[in-house]
A protein has these predicted regions:
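A glycine-rich beta-turn/hairpin centered on an aromatic-Pro dipeptide
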Residues: 412-418
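Transmembrane helical cores of multi-pass secondary ion antiporters/exchangers
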Residues: 1-403, 407, 417
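Short aromatic/hydrophobic contact patches that present stacked aromatics
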Residues: 92, 424, 474
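Short beta-strands and strand-coil junctions in structured, solvent-facing domains, enriched
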Residues: 78-81, 299-300, 434, 457-458, ...
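Cytosolic Rossmann-like ligand/nucleotide-binding regulatory domains
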Residues: 428-480
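Short, compositionally biased
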Residues: 465, 485-488
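Short glycine-/aliphatic-rich beta-strand segments at the starts of folded cytosolic domains
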Residues: 419-427
Length: 488
Protein backbone atom coordinates (compact mmCIF):
# COMPACT_ATOMS: atom_id res chain seq x y z
CA UNK A 1 0.00 0.00 0.00
CA UNK A 2 1.21 3.50 -0.78
CA UNK A 3 0.24 6.81 0.81
CA UNK A 4 -2.47 8.77 -1.03
CA UNK A 5 -4.49 11.86 -0.15
CA UNK A 6 -7.51 9.61 0.50
CA UNK A 7 -5.94 7.16 2.93
CA UNK A 8 -3.25 9.24 4.68
CA UNK A 9 -5.54 10.33 7.54
CA UNK A 10 -6.87 6.79 8.03
CA UNK A 11 -3.39 5.25 8.05
CA UNK A 12 -2.02 8.02 10.27
CA UNK A 13 -4.80 7.73 12.84
CA UNK A 14 -4.41 3.94 13.04
CA UNK A 15 -0.64 4.26 13.49
CA UNK A 16 -1.06 6.88 16.23
CA UNK A 17 -3.69 4.80 18.03
CA UNK A 18 -1.61 1.60 17.92
CA UNK A 19 1.53 3.47 19.02
CA UNK A 20 -0.16 5.03 22.06
CA UNK A 21 -1.69 1.72 23.18
CA UNK A 22 1.57 -0.18 22.69
CA UNK A 23 3.55 2.63 24.33
CA UNK A 24 1.30 2.56 27.41
CA UNK A 25 1.87 -1.19 27.77
CA UNK A 26 5.63 -0.80 27.41
CA UNK A 27 5.69 2.08 29.91
CA UNK A 28 4.35 -0.23 32.62
CA UNK A 29 7.12 -2.78 32.07
CA UNK A 30 9.98 -0.29 31.72
CA UNK A 31 10.44 -0.84 27.98
CA UNK A 32 11.50 2.33 26.09
CA UNK A 33 8.49 3.71 24.24
CA UNK A 34 10.86 4.79 21.47
CA UNK A 35 11.67 1.16 20.73
CA UNK A 36 7.99 0.26 20.55
CA UNK A 37 7.18 3.17 18.22
CA UNK A 38 9.99 2.08 15.90
CA UNK A 39 8.73 -1.51 15.97
CA UNK A 40 5.18 -0.38 15.12
CA UNK A 41 6.56 1.53 12.14
CA UNK A 42 8.57 -1.49 10.99
CA UNK A 43 5.57 -3.81 11.34
CA UNK A 44 3.46 -1.53 9.15
CA UNK A 45 6.33 -0.91 6.70
CA UNK A 46 7.37 -2.47 3.40
CA UNK A 47 8.54 -5.74 4.98
CA UNK A 48 5.44 -5.92 7.20
CA UNK A 49 1.94 -4.87 6.22
CA UNK A 50 3.25 -3.20 3.08
CA UNK A 51 3.09 0.56 3.64
CA UNK A 52 5.55 2.11 1.18
CA UNK A 53 7.60 5.02 2.54
CA UNK A 54 11.08 5.32 1.03
CA UNK A 55 11.74 9.06 0.78
CA UNK A 56 14.71 9.84 3.04
CA UNK A 57 14.33 13.56 2.31
CA UNK A 58 10.76 13.60 3.66
CA UNK A 59 11.87 11.61 6.71
CA UNK A 60 14.72 14.07 7.26
CA UNK A 61 12.32 17.02 7.12
CA UNK A 62 9.90 15.37 9.56
CA UNK A 63 12.83 14.58 11.86
CA UNK A 64 14.13 18.16 11.65
CA UNK A 65 10.74 19.63 12.62
CA UNK A 66 10.21 17.08 15.40
CA UNK A 67 13.73 17.47 16.80
CA UNK A 68 13.39 21.27 16.88
CA UNK A 69 10.24 20.94 19.00
CA UNK A 70 11.76 18.24 21.23
CA UNK A 71 14.96 20.21 21.90
CA UNK A 72 13.07 23.44 22.60
CA UNK A 73 10.76 21.63 25.01
CA UNK A 74 13.77 19.98 26.64
CA UNK A 75 15.37 23.40 27.06
CA UNK A 76 12.20 24.71 28.72
CA UNK A 77 12.37 21.87 31.24
CA UNK A 78 16.05 22.55 32.04
CA UNK A 79 16.29 24.70 35.17
CA UNK A 80 19.34 26.88 35.85
CA UNK A 81 19.37 26.15 39.57
CA UNK A 82 19.45 22.39 38.90
CA UNK A 83 22.16 22.36 36.22
CA UNK A 84 24.37 25.01 37.84
CA UNK A 85 26.25 22.54 40.13
CA UNK A 86 26.97 20.16 37.23
CA UNK A 87 27.42 22.67 34.40
CA UNK A 88 31.09 21.75 33.87
CA UNK A 89 30.80 17.96 33.49
CA UNK A 90 27.55 18.29 31.52
CA UNK A 91 29.08 20.59 28.90
CA UNK A 92 32.28 18.54 28.66
CA UNK A 93 30.27 15.35 28.09
CA UNK A 94 28.11 17.00 25.42
CA UNK A 95 31.08 18.37 23.46
CA UNK A 96 34.36 16.57 24.12
CA UNK A 97 32.44 13.39 24.97
CA UNK A 98 30.71 13.38 21.58
CA UNK A 99 34.03 13.99 19.80
CA UNK A 100 35.77 11.16 21.66
CA UNK A 101 32.88 8.74 21.13
CA UNK A 102 32.89 9.51 17.40
CA UNK A 103 36.68 9.15 17.21
CA UNK A 104 36.96 5.86 19.13
CA UNK A 105 33.96 4.30 17.38
CA UNK A 106 35.04 5.56 13.95
CA UNK A 107 38.51 4.03 14.31
CA UNK A 108 36.98 0.74 15.45
CA UNK A 109 34.57 0.70 12.47
CA UNK A 110 37.47 1.37 10.09
CA UNK A 111 39.48 -1.47 11.66
CA UNK A 112 36.54 -3.90 11.53
CA UNK A 113 35.65 -3.02 7.94
CA UNK A 114 39.17 -3.93 6.85
CA UNK A 115 38.99 -7.46 8.29
CA UNK A 116 38.80 -10.35 5.84
CA UNK A 117 35.62 -11.78 7.37
CA UNK A 118 33.75 -8.44 7.30
CA UNK A 119 31.11 -7.96 4.58
CA UNK A 120 31.60 -4.17 4.55
CA UNK A 121 34.43 -1.83 3.68
CA UNK A 122 34.41 1.81 4.69
CA UNK A 123 37.29 4.29 4.31
CA UNK A 124 38.36 6.20 7.42
CA UNK A 125 36.32 9.33 6.63
CA UNK A 126 33.13 7.34 6.02
CA UNK A 127 33.79 5.33 9.19
CA UNK A 128 34.05 8.56 11.17
CA UNK A 129 30.86 9.83 9.51
CA UNK A 130 29.02 6.67 10.55
CA UNK A 131 30.29 7.06 14.12
CA UNK A 132 29.37 10.76 14.20
CA UNK A 133 25.74 10.14 13.27
CA UNK A 134 25.28 8.02 16.40
CA UNK A 135 27.56 9.88 18.81
CA UNK A 136 24.72 11.65 20.69
CA UNK A 137 22.55 10.12 23.40
CA UNK A 138 18.81 10.01 24.10
CA UNK A 139 18.34 10.55 27.82
CA UNK A 140 14.64 11.35 27.32
CA UNK A 141 14.02 7.60 27.09
CA UNK A 142 16.09 7.10 30.25
CA UNK A 143 13.90 9.40 32.32
CA UNK A 144 10.69 7.98 30.88
CA UNK A 145 11.82 4.55 32.11
CA UNK A 146 12.82 5.89 35.53
CA UNK A 147 9.44 7.62 35.88
CA UNK A 148 7.62 4.41 34.96
CA UNK A 149 9.56 2.67 37.75
CA UNK A 150 8.90 5.64 40.12
CA UNK A 151 12.66 6.13 40.47
CA UNK A 152 14.97 9.14 40.64
CA UNK A 153 18.78 9.41 40.73
CA UNK A 154 21.20 10.53 43.44
CA UNK A 155 24.21 12.87 43.21
CA UNK A 156 22.68 15.30 40.68
CA UNK A 157 22.90 12.63 37.97
CA UNK A 158 19.52 13.47 36.50
CA UNK A 159 20.25 17.15 35.65
CA UNK A 160 23.71 16.21 34.38
CA UNK A 161 22.28 13.63 31.98
CA UNK A 162 19.51 16.01 30.94
CA UNK A 163 22.05 18.72 30.14
CA UNK A 164 24.23 16.26 28.22
CA UNK A 165 21.37 14.83 26.16
CA UNK A 166 19.89 18.23 25.40
CA UNK A 167 23.15 19.79 24.25
CA UNK A 168 24.97 16.90 22.56
CA UNK A 169 22.63 16.57 19.56
CA UNK A 170 23.92 19.87 18.08
CA UNK A 171 27.51 18.62 18.40
CA UNK A 172 26.71 15.33 16.65
CA UNK A 173 24.85 17.26 13.95
CA UNK A 174 27.86 19.51 13.32
CA UNK A 175 30.20 16.53 13.09
CA UNK A 176 27.87 14.84 10.61
CA UNK A 177 27.48 17.91 8.37
CA UNK A 178 31.20 18.79 8.41
CA UNK A 179 32.24 15.23 7.54
CA UNK A 180 29.72 15.07 4.68
CA UNK A 181 31.18 18.33 3.34
CA UNK A 182 34.72 16.99 3.77
CA UNK A 183 33.92 13.75 1.90
CA UNK A 184 32.24 15.60 -0.96
CA UNK A 185 34.85 18.37 -1.15
CA UNK A 186 38.42 17.07 -1.18
CA UNK A 187 39.78 20.63 -0.95
CA UNK A 188 38.38 21.26 2.56
CA UNK A 189 41.26 21.67 4.99
CA UNK A 190 41.60 21.50 8.77
CA UNK A 191 41.27 25.28 9.07
CA UNK A 192 37.97 25.26 7.20
CA UNK A 193 36.65 22.44 9.41
CA UNK A 194 37.59 24.25 12.63
CA UNK A 195 36.18 27.50 11.28
CA UNK A 196 32.88 25.81 10.43
CA UNK A 197 32.63 24.44 13.98
CA UNK A 198 33.36 27.82 15.55
CA UNK A 199 30.87 29.68 13.35
CA UNK A 200 28.11 27.15 13.99
CA UNK A 201 28.66 27.30 17.75
CA UNK A 202 28.92 31.08 18.05
CA UNK A 203 26.04 31.90 15.70
CA UNK A 204 23.85 29.14 17.16
CA UNK A 205 24.43 30.19 20.78
CA UNK A 206 24.02 33.92 20.04
CA UNK A 207 20.86 33.42 17.97
CA UNK A 208 19.34 31.17 20.63
CA UNK A 209 20.00 33.74 23.36
CA UNK A 210 18.78 36.77 21.41
CA UNK A 211 15.68 35.10 19.95
CA UNK A 212 14.87 33.49 23.30
CA UNK A 213 14.89 36.95 24.89
CA UNK A 214 12.73 38.27 22.04
CA UNK A 215 10.24 35.42 22.52
CA UNK A 216 9.95 36.22 26.24
CA UNK A 217 9.37 39.90 25.50
CA UNK A 218 6.68 39.20 22.91
CA UNK A 219 4.87 36.66 25.10
CA UNK A 220 4.73 39.15 27.97
CA UNK A 221 4.10 42.36 26.04
CA UNK A 222 1.87 41.28 23.15
CA UNK A 223 -1.74 41.54 24.28
CA UNK A 224 -3.75 38.81 22.53
CA UNK A 225 -7.43 38.44 23.44
CA UNK A 226 -7.43 34.69 22.79
CA UNK A 227 -4.89 33.12 25.18
CA UNK A 228 -4.90 29.89 23.16
CA UNK A 229 -2.80 31.74 20.56
CA UNK A 230 0.16 32.24 22.91
CA UNK A 231 1.49 28.65 22.55
CA UNK A 232 1.08 28.93 18.77
CA UNK A 233 3.07 32.18 18.83
CA UNK A 234 5.85 30.39 20.72
CA UNK A 235 5.79 27.51 18.23
CA UNK A 236 6.29 30.02 15.42
CA UNK A 237 9.33 31.32 17.32
CA UNK A 238 10.75 27.78 17.53
CA UNK A 239 10.65 27.31 13.77
CA UNK A 240 11.81 30.87 13.11
CA UNK A 241 14.77 30.41 15.47
CA UNK A 242 15.88 27.20 13.76
CA UNK A 243 15.45 28.53 10.23
CA UNK A 244 17.06 31.95 10.65
CA UNK A 245 20.01 30.42 12.53
CA UNK A 246 20.53 27.87 9.78
CA UNK A 247 20.30 30.67 7.21
CA UNK A 248 23.09 32.50 9.09
CA UNK A 249 25.25 29.33 8.93
CA UNK A 250 24.74 28.63 12.63
CA UNK A 251 23.59 25.48 14.42
CA UNK A 252 19.80 25.59 14.48
CA UNK A 253 19.46 22.75 16.99
CA UNK A 254 21.75 24.51 19.46
CA UNK A 255 19.79 27.73 18.96
CA UNK A 256 16.38 26.21 19.72
CA UNK A 257 17.75 24.42 22.80
CA UNK A 258 19.24 27.64 24.22
CA UNK A 259 16.08 29.58 23.33
CA UNK A 260 14.08 26.94 25.22
CA UNK A 261 16.31 27.37 28.29
CA UNK A 262 15.81 31.14 28.14
CA UNK A 263 12.01 30.84 27.94
CA UNK A 264 11.81 28.14 30.62
CA UNK A 265 13.86 30.09 33.15
CA UNK A 266 12.06 33.43 32.87
CA UNK A 267 8.61 34.62 33.85
CA UNK A 268 6.16 34.32 30.96
CA UNK A 269 2.43 34.83 30.64
CA UNK A 270 0.17 31.76 30.43
CA UNK A 271 3.00 29.41 31.47
CA UNK A 272 0.67 26.51 32.30
CA UNK A 273 -1.11 26.64 28.93
CA UNK A 274 2.21 26.88 27.08
CA UNK A 275 3.77 23.96 28.95
CA UNK A 276 0.70 21.77 28.44
CA UNK A 277 0.65 22.59 24.72
CA UNK A 278 4.40 21.95 24.28
CA UNK A 279 4.28 18.68 26.24
CA UNK A 280 1.51 17.28 24.05
CA UNK A 281 3.18 18.55 20.88
CA UNK A 282 6.49 16.98 21.94
CA UNK A 283 4.88 13.58 22.38
CA UNK A 284 3.11 13.88 19.02
CA UNK A 285 6.40 14.87 17.37
CA UNK A 286 8.22 11.90 18.89
CA UNK A 287 5.54 9.42 17.84
CA UNK A 288 5.38 10.72 14.25
CA UNK A 289 9.17 10.85 13.98
CA UNK A 290 9.69 7.32 15.29
CA UNK A 291 6.90 5.89 13.14
CA UNK A 292 8.32 7.51 9.99
CA UNK A 293 11.80 6.16 10.71
CA UNK A 294 10.35 2.71 11.36
CA UNK A 295 8.47 2.87 8.05
CA UNK A 296 11.59 4.07 6.22
CA UNK A 297 13.81 1.11 7.08
CA UNK A 298 13.76 -2.20 5.21
CA UNK A 299 14.41 -4.86 7.89
CA UNK A 300 15.75 -7.41 5.38
CA UNK A 301 18.48 -4.94 4.35
CA UNK A 302 19.27 -4.25 7.99
CA UNK A 303 19.73 -7.96 8.70
CA UNK A 304 22.41 -8.18 6.01
CA UNK A 305 24.72 -6.05 8.18
CA UNK A 306 23.47 -7.40 11.52
CA UNK A 307 26.70 -9.17 12.52
CA UNK A 308 28.97 -6.17 11.93
CA UNK A 309 26.41 -3.74 13.40
CA UNK A 310 26.07 -5.89 16.53
CA UNK A 311 29.85 -5.90 16.98
CA UNK A 312 30.00 -2.10 16.61
CA UNK A 313 27.09 -1.69 19.02
CA UNK A 314 28.76 -3.87 21.66
CA UNK A 315 31.97 -1.85 21.27
CA UNK A 316 30.08 1.42 21.80
CA UNK A 317 28.29 0.11 24.90
CA UNK A 318 31.25 -1.67 26.53
CA UNK A 319 34.28 0.38 25.43
CA UNK A 320 33.54 3.52 23.37
CA UNK A 321 31.03 5.29 25.64
CA UNK A 322 32.69 4.29 28.98
CA UNK A 323 36.15 5.33 27.77
CA UNK A 324 34.83 8.71 26.61
CA UNK A 325 32.94 9.29 29.86
CA UNK A 326 35.86 8.39 32.13
CA UNK A 327 38.26 10.61 30.17
CA UNK A 328 35.81 13.54 30.20
CA UNK A 329 35.12 13.24 33.93
CA UNK A 330 38.76 12.94 35.01
CA UNK A 331 38.98 16.61 36.11
CA UNK A 332 35.81 16.33 38.21
CA UNK A 333 37.00 14.53 41.34
CA UNK A 334 33.72 14.87 43.25
CA UNK A 335 31.86 12.55 40.86
CA UNK A 336 31.91 9.06 42.38
CA UNK A 337 33.04 5.92 40.57
CA UNK A 338 29.51 4.49 40.70
CA UNK A 339 28.15 7.65 39.10
CA UNK A 340 30.73 7.42 36.30
CA UNK A 341 29.79 3.79 35.65
CA UNK A 342 26.09 4.67 35.50
CA UNK A 343 26.63 7.63 33.16
CA UNK A 344 28.65 5.28 30.93
CA UNK A 345 25.80 2.77 30.83
CA UNK A 346 22.99 5.21 30.01
CA UNK A 347 24.48 6.39 26.71
CA UNK A 348 21.24 5.34 25.07
CA UNK A 349 20.94 5.78 21.29
CA UNK A 350 17.55 7.03 20.11
CA UNK A 351 15.84 8.47 17.07
CA UNK A 352 18.37 11.30 16.62
CA UNK A 353 21.15 9.05 15.24
CA UNK A 354 18.67 7.62 12.72
CA UNK A 355 17.65 11.13 11.66
CA UNK A 356 21.29 12.15 11.25
CA UNK A 357 21.88 8.95 9.25
CA UNK A 358 19.44 10.26 6.63
CA UNK A 359 21.74 13.23 5.90
CA UNK A 360 24.37 11.12 4.08
CA UNK A 361 21.54 9.39 2.16
CA UNK A 362 20.05 12.70 1.01
CA UNK A 363 23.52 14.07 0.20
CA UNK A 364 24.31 11.00 -1.92
CA UNK A 365 27.40 9.94 0.04
CA UNK A 366 28.80 6.62 -1.15
CA UNK A 367 27.78 3.84 1.24
CA UNK A 368 25.02 5.96 2.81
CA UNK A 369 22.41 3.17 2.73
CA UNK A 370 24.88 0.97 4.58
CA UNK A 371 25.35 3.73 7.18
CA UNK A 372 21.58 4.08 7.66
CA UNK A 373 21.01 0.35 8.18
CA UNK A 374 23.92 -0.01 10.61
CA UNK A 375 22.78 2.99 12.67
CA UNK A 376 19.21 1.69 12.80
CA UNK A 377 20.32 -1.75 13.97
CA UNK A 378 22.66 -0.31 16.64
CA UNK A 379 19.85 1.94 17.91
CA UNK A 380 17.63 -1.11 18.42
CA UNK A 381 20.47 -2.98 20.17
CA UNK A 382 21.09 -0.02 22.47
CA UNK A 383 17.41 0.34 23.37
CA UNK A 384 17.00 -3.37 24.04
CA UNK A 385 20.22 -3.87 26.04
CA UNK A 386 20.60 -0.54 27.85
CA UNK A 387 17.02 0.69 27.85
CA UNK A 388 15.59 -2.34 29.63
CA UNK A 389 18.33 -2.49 32.30
CA UNK A 390 18.61 1.15 33.40
CA UNK A 391 16.55 0.82 36.59
CA UNK A 392 18.32 -2.46 37.45
CA UNK A 393 21.78 -0.88 37.06
CA UNK A 394 20.71 2.16 39.13
CA UNK A 395 19.61 -0.12 41.98
CA UNK A 396 22.74 -2.29 41.79
CA UNK A 397 24.95 0.81 42.03
CA UNK A 398 22.77 2.21 44.85
CA UNK A 399 22.08 5.37 42.85
CA UNK A 400 18.29 5.15 42.81
CA UNK A 401 15.94 7.00 45.13
CA UNK A 402 12.16 7.44 45.25
CA UNK A 403 10.71 9.89 42.77
CA UNK A 404 9.92 13.14 44.52
CA UNK A 405 6.37 14.33 44.27
CA UNK A 406 5.86 17.44 42.14
CA UNK A 407 2.88 19.76 42.10
CA UNK A 408 -0.14 19.12 44.35
CA UNK A 409 -3.04 16.68 44.56
CA UNK A 410 -5.59 19.34 43.59
CA UNK A 411 -4.42 19.92 40.00
CA UNK A 412 -4.26 23.67 40.69
CA UNK A 413 -1.50 25.99 39.49
CA UNK A 414 -0.96 29.70 39.97
CA UNK A 415 -0.27 32.12 37.12
CA UNK A 416 3.40 33.09 36.88
CA UNK A 417 2.65 36.72 37.75
CA UNK A 418 1.25 35.77 41.20
CA UNK A 419 4.24 35.80 43.52
CA UNK A 420 3.15 32.88 45.74
CA UNK A 421 3.64 29.14 46.12
CA UNK A 422 1.07 26.33 46.27
CA UNK A 423 1.58 23.19 48.35
CA UNK A 424 -0.54 20.57 50.04
CA UNK A 425 -0.57 18.93 53.45
CA UNK A 426 -2.13 15.68 54.64
CA UNK A 427 -3.57 15.66 58.17
CA UNK A 428 -2.15 12.88 60.36
CA UNK A 429 -3.23 11.46 63.70
CA UNK A 430 -0.43 13.25 65.55
CA UNK A 431 -1.49 16.59 64.02
CA UNK A 432 -5.06 16.09 65.27
CA UNK A 433 -3.79 15.54 68.81
CA UNK A 434 -2.32 19.06 68.74
CA UNK A 435 -5.13 20.80 66.84
CA UNK A 436 -8.38 19.52 65.36
CA UNK A 437 -9.63 22.75 63.76
CA UNK A 438 -8.06 25.08 61.22
CA UNK A 439 -7.91 28.05 63.57
CA UNK A 440 -5.87 26.03 66.09
CA UNK A 441 -3.29 24.86 63.54
CA UNK A 442 0.16 26.38 63.81
CA UNK A 443 0.69 27.32 60.16
CA UNK A 444 3.69 29.41 59.03
CA UNK A 445 3.15 33.16 58.82
CA UNK A 446 1.69 34.22 55.48
CA UNK A 447 0.19 30.77 54.77
CA UNK A 448 -3.52 30.33 54.05
CA UNK A 449 -5.68 27.23 53.55
CA UNK A 450 -7.53 27.55 50.24
CA UNK A 451 -9.54 24.31 50.19
CA UNK A 452 -9.86 21.01 52.05
CA UNK A 453 -10.24 17.66 50.29
CA UNK A 454 -11.93 14.86 52.24
CA UNK A 455 -12.18 11.72 50.16
CA UNK A 456 -13.92 12.80 46.96
CA UNK A 457 -15.49 15.86 48.62
CA UNK A 458 -14.09 19.41 48.51
CA UNK A 459 -14.81 21.65 51.51
CA UNK A 460 -14.58 25.45 51.73
CA UNK A 461 -12.40 26.10 54.79
CA UNK A 462 -13.24 28.25 57.79
CA UNK A 463 -11.64 28.51 61.19
CA UNK A 464 -14.13 26.21 62.95
CA UNK A 465 -13.91 23.36 60.41
CA UNK A 466 -13.27 20.07 62.23
CA UNK A 467 -10.37 18.22 60.64
CA UNK A 468 -10.28 14.46 60.05
CA UNK A 469 -7.33 12.15 59.64
CA UNK A 470 -6.43 11.92 55.93
CA UNK A 471 -7.81 15.36 55.03
CA UNK A 472 -5.72 17.15 52.40
CA UNK A 473 -5.21 20.89 52.65
CA UNK A 474 -4.30 23.11 49.70
CA UNK A 475 -2.01 25.87 51.01
CA UNK A 476 -0.93 29.16 49.48
CA UNK A 477 2.10 30.95 50.90
CA UNK A 478 4.45 33.80 50.13
CA UNK A 479 7.38 32.85 47.90
CA UNK A 480 10.66 32.88 49.81
CA UNK A 481 13.35 35.39 48.83
CA UNK A 482 15.71 32.50 48.02
CA UNK A 483 13.24 31.06 45.49
CA UNK A 484 12.70 34.48 43.92
CA UNK A 485 16.46 34.86 43.47
CA UNK A 486 16.71 31.42 41.83
CA UNK A 487 13.93 32.19 39.34
CA UNK A 488 15.37 35.53 38.24
Amino acid sequence: MIFTAENTLLIGSILLFVSIVVGKTGYRFGVPTLLLFLVVGMLFGSDGLGLQFHDAKDAQFIGMVALSIILFSGGMDTKFREIKPILGPGIVLSTVGVLLTALFTGLFIWWVSGMSWSNIYLPITTSLLLASTMSSTDSASVFAILRSQKMNLKHNLRPMLELESGSNDPMAYMLTIVLIQFIQSSGMGVGAIVGSFVIQFIVGAAAGYVLGKLAIRMLNKLNIDNQALYPILLLAFVFFTFSITDLLKGNGYLAVYIAGIMVGNNKIMHRKDIYTFMDGLTWLSQIIMFLCLGLLVNPHEMLEVAAVALLIGVFMIIIGRPLSVFLCLLPFRKITMKSRIFVSWVGLRGAVPIIFATYPVVAGVEGSNLIFNIVFFITIVSLVVQGTTISFVARILNLSKPLEKTGNDFGVELPEEIDSDLSDMTITKSMLEEADTLKDMNLPKGTLVMIVKRGDEFLIPNGTLKLHEGDKLLLISEKSKEEETDSD
